[in-house]
Amino acid sequence: MGFIFASKTVATKMASLNLFSGHKIIAVPDGPLLDERFADHVDLKVFCDDKIILSPDVAEEVIHQIRGAISESWIQSRVVIGDKTPRMPYPNDVPYNVLALKQHLIHKLEITEPQILKHCHKPVINVRQGYTRCSVLPVGEQAVITDDASLGDTLRTLGYDVLIICKGHVQLAGFPYGLFGGSGGSIGNKVVMNGCLKFHPDAERIKQFILKHHKVLIELDDQQPLIDCGSILFYDEGVS
């Protein structure tokens, strides 16, 4: 079993499918101090790697949902409440928006939530992009898709297989466009997208890249373009 962290809207979509029955879907509440246009974005309030690290303003409700599925001792050993509460303006909204890959932790380190760094047991890489997780979609352990060319170049130098796609073509209400990494997430052998890739000009390249890495593409809606939902995050219960 694992834990899937999603916005309330996306959690409802996922719960209606029979594809995630082996996992517990957690509907993460909005961040009260964030811009209402992206207050529901999960990756601004939750970080998953060796530990689940939660912003203080959503921790109580998220832990309550986790508690219904697993032991108290497990929660005490795996769940950490962060020091920072995300708030406006930037960069105060992104301390949890950290990209965790198999071998590296990547973020604008001067603004990273201290508990993330404290519990990190892998090399940390400093980049200029504060919205790091929003900008990158992990596809397995050694591959990523990004619409940020600079981040893509950095990840290539670190040995990752990187697909760089065009910016835009991801909806985010109130903004010209959202970020591709924020429109989905990896759950086991599945890459889950909040919307349909057919509306994206790089759809075929993205699909082939996902297939190349032996993942199954799941689209939560076949009638609308991708929507930046602040990522879909996954924590495998078996992670030590």
Placement of each model-derived feature along the sequence:
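The feature marks the mature, well-folded catalytic cores of soluble enzymes
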Residues: M1-S240
